[in-house]
Amino acid sequence: MSNIIKQIEQEQMKQDVPSFRPGDSVEVKVWVVEGTKKRLQAFEGVVIAIRNRGLHSAFTVRKISNGEGVERVFQTHSPVIDSISVKRRGAVRKAKLYYLRERTGKSARIKERLG
């Protein structure tokens, strides 16, 4: 029974997901439905957490919009996501960057990973 579930989940998973880690700046293009119109909306920010659970994998992106911190959780293999592009690689030592929630300005910056 579990082999059937694994096979179905494998078919549902996206193959074109780029590799990114916490600290990386990414741009996620999401399909948004407004009335009868359907358009792409970009959400660009820093990945502060990744949850790896196969088909149920998710990642959290944080950005500052009009001086207010905005976080959004995306399901990695969701059909709502059109594309994910990595803009900048960040050098961090933790898997969860929740400490960025309390920081503002220069203390919230992340060094760029070289190589």
Swiss-Prot record:
<comment type="function">
    <text>This protein is located at the 30S-50S ribosomal subunit interface and may play a role in the structure and function of the aminoacyl-tRNA binding site.</text>
</comment>
<keyword id="KW-0687">Ribonucleoprotein</keyword>
<dbReference type="InterPro" id="IPR018257">
    <property type="entry name" value="Ribosomal_bL19_CS"/>
</dbReference>
<dbReference type="InterPro" id="IPR038657">
    <property type="entry name" value="Ribosomal_bL19_sf"/>
</dbReference>
<dbReference type="GO" id="GO:0022625">
    <property type="term" value="C:cytosolic large ribosomal subunit"/>
</dbReference>
<dbReference type="InterPro" id="IPR001857">
    <property type="entry name" value="Ribosomal_bL19"/>
</dbReference>
<dbReference type="Pfam" id="PF01245">
    <property type="entry name" value="Ribosomal_L19"/>
</dbReference>
<keyword id="KW-0689">Ribosomal protein</keyword>
<dbReference type="GO" id="GO:0003735">
    <property type="term" value="F:structural constituent of ribosome"/>
</dbReference>
<dbReference type="GO" id="GO:0006412">
    <property type="term" value="P:translation"/>
</dbReference>
<protein>
    <recommendedName>
        <fullName>Large ribosomal subunit protein bL19</fullName>
    </recommendedName>
</protein>
<dbReference type="InterPro" id="IPR008991">
    <property type="entry name" value="Translation_prot_SH3-like_sf"/>
</dbReference>
<comment type="similarity">
    <text>Belongs to the bacterial ribosomal protein bL19 family.</text>
</comment>
